[in-house]
Amino acid sequence: VETIESEGCEAVLPGLMWFVYNCLSAGDYNYKTFGTDKWSRHVKKAFRALLMQYQKPVTTALRKSTRFEVPTPITELMADAQRIVQLGNQAGEGWYLVGEMVDMIREGVPNIAVVQPFACLPNHVTGRGIFREIRRQFPQANVVSVDYDPGASQVNQLNRIKLMAATARDRNVSEERDAGQAVRPEPDEEIPTSPPTASRPDLNGKPVMELSVHL
C-alpha cells in the first residue's frame, strides 16, 4: 500500500468480511451441482444472514456519507463472477476474486494488483487464468500479478507495481486529453475550467488513480 501511495495513487483494498461471505455463499450451488449436505447450506445461509444483520448499521451509515461508498452485496459479486467463471471455481479465492475484479472495474478502479503469496498455488492458477478474459471484456483493465515467494526479488516486485502505476498515469492523462478534445465549444460558449476525467477527484480536487490489492 505504501508503494502504491508513494506513486501518487489511491489504494483500494477489498473488505475482509466479504471474504467470509465468500465462504458462506456457494452452499446452494454446491448442493445442486455437487450434491453436498443440504443442512450445511442452510447453516451457511443462516450464518451469513446473521453477519449481515450486524453489518447493517455500518451499511446504513455509509449510505448517508458523501465520502465513502457502500460495498457491493456478495450476491451481486456472484452474478459478476458468472460472466467469466462458474461458482464451482472455488480453488483459492476462485469466483470471489473474479467477481471482485469485475466489480472494481465497473466502479472505476481498472488498475488491479493481484498480490499473492507463494503458498497459495490455487490462486496462481485462478488469478492468472482469468486475466485474459478480464482484459477482453474490459479493455481498460490494467491488471498485474505480484507474487511473493522466497525466490522472488523485491526489486522485481516493486518494479511491477511501479510499471502498473505508470501505465495508469499515462492512461489517465490520455483520457483527460481526449475528453478535452471531444467537446469543442462554440465561440460564445463558456469553456469549462477543467475537463471531466475518469478518475475520482480527491479532497483537493486533483484527480487520483485507484488501485486494488488482492491478498
Regions found by a protein language model. Name each.
Residues V1-L215:
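An N-terminal assembly and electron-transfer interface module characteristic of large anaerobic redox
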